[in-house]
């Protein structure tokens, strides 16, 4: 399956990197690359591996060794990455 990152998910990664970079630029790059690597490595061949999402019609990939969760939606042969959230964040009712 193809991975398609939404503009919102890309913005989430950009903001996350900037936030972490205030304290540790090297760690910021590493965290963002870790998230991207896990999504791109795991979901194309195992799109159902994420848990059922809090928002109907979505699934969630928990990124190992981080507090981040990536909600996504399956549409035909595409895994649409919707957002990148901190697990402690209050989630919206729709994505």
Language-model segment annotations:
Residues 68-69, 73-95:
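Enriched for short, Lys/Arg-rich terminal
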Residues 2-59, 94:
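Basic, Lys/Arg-enriched alpha-helical interface segments
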Residues 62-65:
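A short catalytic or substrate-binding loop motif that flags glycine-/basic-rich loops and adjacent residues
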């Amino acid at each position: 399956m193809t991975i398609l990152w939404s503009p919102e998910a890309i913005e989430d990664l950009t903001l996350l990197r900037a936030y972490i970079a205030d304290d540790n630029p090297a760690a910021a790059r590493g965290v963002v690359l870790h998230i991207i690597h896990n999504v791109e490595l795991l979901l194309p061949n195992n799109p159902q591996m994420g848990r059922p999402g809090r928002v109907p019609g979505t699934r969630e990939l928990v990124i190992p060794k981080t507090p981040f969760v990536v909600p996504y939606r399956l549409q035909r042969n595409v895994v649409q990455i919707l957002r990148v959230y901190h697990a402690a964040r209050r989630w919206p009712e729709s994505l």
